[in-house]
Swiss-Prot record:
The gene is dltA. Keywords: ATP-binding, Cytoplasm, Ligase, Nucleotide-binding. D-alanine binds at residues 197, 301, 492. This is D-alanine--D-alanyl carrier protein ligase. Belongs to the ATP-dependent AMP-binding enzyme family. DltA subfamily. HAMAP family: DltA. It comes from Bacillus cereus (strain ZK / E33L).
Length: 504
């Protein structure tokens, strides 16, 4: 598959087909091509000998997609940066990535960034003044060059830039279109922010099949009335989200085939799909196919998939995450470095062309997590699991990294920032489960000196500081104050004891 050519084909064959919809804003495939060509031409003229990544800032604006394609047509990887990401984290991404340029689809509130900022108005001028110019196709990102870089949580307090190449993305997109039986011209739900790699599961499968991306933003999600009004208008046929988002939608009685009569496929990734959520979806959408998938950002969105039927639900209380895509393979590694036999638990290692080339500017972290096996790139996921008859079962994290509401985070990073707060002497983050999946984060804090009379005022002050350093989804929901943190005999935090204390 020639990814960019495949997307551009629709600008010629169906130029007026809508490529992307967000509220009242929409763009056609013709406009997507013209504006991304104009932008790529401008980037190439401004930075003729430069291939540094470009930051793309915004939320669900159509310009985000235009900017992504404009960057890669000019030979630059893009770094999606959502509006919700705090200033301090944006600053660290800018510094780590070596980006020289930031394209903005929304007002940039972060100050003193070491990059040139192209505002919304500047972008419109570029689209207008460079209209009709086409970039040199030889300049476009190809092969093992980076297509996008997504920053994920890092245990040192610094986010890690996962480099995904053109070949990685082509491998994923081709597999998704074929294995999930995606058809030409379908409407895809776009619920995940672009800085979360779940969004890649809908963006490129939609664009290469001439589909329409229907974007739902965070404000809509916060207002159910607006959310369901939008869904009712959408005629979505391919649903891509975390299971948590679907579970929230199922709380609305009208969320069913009557609201979305042409729903054909549910694609789930990012966290555990509970058996009962899948069962309810089958009841509400009897004609739709439900696919459960698995994969870390470092292996390009997902590498396994399984069609969840009533038979599968009856057979497994905890659902399997699927069979591996044909060009990759899964190894289950035991602690001694040998491969575990069928049915035995160990660390999931992914091998093949979906695997990232590593973390940008972090050779030590890359060496720790990535390796070569039989001449192919391999990623040690840190996830526990086992394979039985080719079917992968996921058993949670081996370390302190978890997925909460679809967002992957390292508890050590949150602890790092929490301990840096005023009024905090010591802190441990305890993820609290509800059934099979994590429900919220509890911060167990040993407070330092403070003058607050009430605990809730202390909590407010700590949360205020955390909001300046971490995205909202990484802020603990509850706080508990103790005089000390339990330790193991070898001087480590006794997390098992702490968990038993807080859940007793």
């Amino acid at each position: 598959m020639k990814l960019l050519e495949q997307i551009e084909k629709w600008a010629i064959e169906t130029p007026d087909q809508t490529a992307f919809v967000w509220r009242d804003a929409k763009i056609t495939y013709k406009q997507l091509k013209e504006d991304s060509d104009a932008l790529a031409h401008w980037i190439s003229s401004e930075y003729p000998d430069d291939r540094s990544p470009i930051m793309v800032y915004g939320h669900m604006q159509p310009e985000m997609i235009i900017n992504f394609l404009g960057c890669v047509k000019a030979g630059h990887a893009y770094i999606p940066v959502d509006l919700s990401i705090p200033a301090d984290r944006v600053q660290r991404i800018a510094e780590n990535s070596g980006a020289k340029l930031l394209l903005s689809a929304a007002t940039v509130t972060v100050t003193d960034l070491p990059v040139r900022i192209v505002s919304e108005d500047n972008l419109k001028d570029i689209f207008f003044t460079h209209k009709g110019n086409t970039p040199n196709p030889e300049h476009a990102v190809k092969g093992d060059e980076n297509f996008y870089i997504i920053y994920t949580s890092g245990s040192t307090g610094n986010p890690k830039g996962v480099q995904i190449t053109y070949n990685c993305l082509v491998s994923f997109t081709q597999w998704a279109v074929e294995d999930f039986n995606l058809q030409t011209g379908q409407v895809f739900l776009n619920q995940a922010p672009f800085s979360f790699d779940l969004s890649v599961m809908d963006i490129y499968p939609s664009l290469v099949t001439g589909g329409t991306l229907w974007a739902i933003d965070k404000d809509m999600i916060a207002r159910p009335k607006d959310l369901f009004a939008s869904l009712e208008q959408s005629d979505i046929q391919v649903w891509t989200s975390t299971p948590s988002f679907a579970e929230m939608c199922l709380m609305e009685a009208s969320f069913s085939e009557s609201m979305l009569p042409n729903m054909k496929t549910f694609l789930f990734c990012g966290e555990v799909l509970p058996n009962e959520v899948a069962r309810k979806l089958i009841e509400r959408f009897p004609k739709a196919t439900i696919m459960n998938t698995y994969g870390p950002t470092e292996a390009t969105v997902a590498v396994t998939g399984i069609h969840v039927t009533e038979e599968v639900l009856d057979q497994y209380k905890s659902l399997p995450v699927g069979y591996c895509k044909s060009d990759c393979r899964l190894l289950i590694m035991k602690e001694d470095g040998t491969i575990a036999p069928d049915g035995e638990k160990g660390e999931i290692v992914i091998v093949g062309p979906s695997v990232s080339v590593g973390y940008l500017g972090s050779p030590e972290l890359t060496e720790k997590a990535f390796t070569m096996i039989d001449g192919e790139r391999a990623y040690k996921t840190g996830d526990a699991g086992y394979v039985e008859n080719g079917l992968l079962f996921y058993n949670g994290r081996l370390d302190f990294q978890i997925k909460l509401h679809g967002y992957r985070m390292e508890l050590e990073e949150i602890e790092h920032h929490l301990r840096a707060c005023s009024y905090v002497e010591g802190a441990v983050i305890v993820p609290i489960k509800k059934g099979e999946k994590y429900d919220y984060l509890l911060a167990v804090v040993v407070p330092g000196e403070h003058s607050f009379e009430k605990e809730f005022k202390l909590t407010s002050a700590i949360k205020k500081e955390l909001n300046e350093r971490l995205p909202n989804y990484m802020i603990p929901r509850k706080f508990m104050y103790q005089s000390s943190i339990p330790m193991t005999p070898n001087g480590k935090v006794d997390r098992k004891k702490l968990l038993s204390e807080v859940t007793a």
